[in-house]
Amino acid sequence: MTSRFPAIAANITKLFAARNTHAVEVAILQPADPFLDMAGEDLRRRIFLTESETGQTLCLRPEFTIPVCLDHISSQAGTPRRYSYLGEVFRQRREGGNEFFQAGIEDLGDRDTAQADARSVADAHALLSLVLPGRSLAVTLGDQGIFEAVLAALGLPRGWRMRLARAFGSAPMLQAALADLANPPRNGQLSGEVAALVLDGDLDGLSTHIAGGMEQAGLSASAGRSPTDIARRLIEKAELRSVRLSNEAFAALKNFLAIHVPLDGAARALETFAAGAGLSLGAALEKFAARAKAIEAHGLPAEKIRYDAAFGRPLDYYTGVVFEIAAQGGERPLAGGGRYDRLLTLLGAKTAIPGVGFSVWLDRIEALREAAP
């Protein structure tokens, strides 16, 4: 390793090699669209954007999961396959530098998702235990799949399920969405003609009306969102406002989000919740229970692992388990990861490839090492 790498880098790469991963390097300059489309609002606003001579929008690499997946697709490598990386990422941050090191593993193509999920948590825990010897670690797990299964079982329409799923991982967004669900805002800001078209769900008529208004105002329909996109969003918002959840269903959703228990009792807590609310969580609960058993089989300290039903991570591509690991009593995560079974298909893979992975923040780890007595 050159001197620009953190002192712990060599030990991390040895661990990666011992865990049967393929070391991969990806370009610092990346096409921006995959990140803008799939990475989530929190990361999107932190990206450093630029433009190529041909007009393509590019960005400095803000994370590794998407570039590693793109590299896998272009290489046409077989699966299952485990990739490891260690390098710099670039994000606008309120604290710390805008350029910092991350390391991690992306585990692609293993159809035994419970075992792959457990292995990812165990890999992250082993890495942190290696570089922070003697430090007590706390693991927090959430599950996007369980959350979406609860929303479906409650009978929420697709638009609301999508909005709440996008908000999962951001406490302010989730609270705002729940507030709107409890008390839908009135649609009083639209003019009479637009309001009528929205109420009728007339996508073509509304698109034509918006296009005419943009033309009169001298606005280019190609400069931003198209008239059809704007019309579709207005109609979707109106449909969301028309839904009011029953008091019983809303109480059930709030009760679900309040579940926060040790992992060894989490499946039982979810079963109790579902039975009390009269809901069937089906395959999502079966997957959850299988994963919990697989994690325990890795010998991780069960008393340090907790399931938080309201816990998510602010990246749009997660579909299942999500997790973070922090020093016991610490406020900032040292590692974070999760499952992203739709991501590779969205990036262009010809067949569905399941994936799960994690990354660690080396600057945060270094700060803890330096502060140790």
UniProtKB/Swiss-Prot annotation:
Which key words are in the record?
Answer: Amino-acid biosynthesis, Cytoplasm, Histidine biosynthesis
Pathway assigned to this chain's UniProt record: Amino-acid biosynthesis; L-histidine biosynthesis; L-histidine from 5-phospho-alpha-D-ribose 1-diphosphate: step 1/9
Has keyword Amino-acid biosynthesis? yes
Q: Which SUPFAM superfamilies has this protein been placed in?
A: Class II aaRS and biotin synthetases
Taxonomically, the superkingdom here is Bacteria
For this chain, one GO molecular function annotation is:
histidine-tRNA ligase activity
Q: List the disulfide bonds.
A: none
Example GO CC term: the record gives: cytoplasm
Where is it located? Answer: Cytoplasm
- Could you tell me which HAMAP family the record lists for this protein? HisZ
Q: What does this protein do?
A: Required for the first step of histidine biosynthesis. May allow the feedback regulation of ATP phosphoribosyltransferase activity by histidine.
NCBIfam families, per the entry: PRK12295.1-4
Miscellaneous note, as given in the UniProt record, is:
This function is generally fulfilled by the C-terminal part of HisG, which is missing in some bacteria such as this one.
The record's family statement is:
Belongs to the class-II aminoacyl-tRNA synthetase family. HisZ subfamily.
Q: What is this protein called?
A: ATP phosphoribosyltransferase regulatory subunit
Q: Which gene is transcribed and translated to give this protein?
A: hisZ
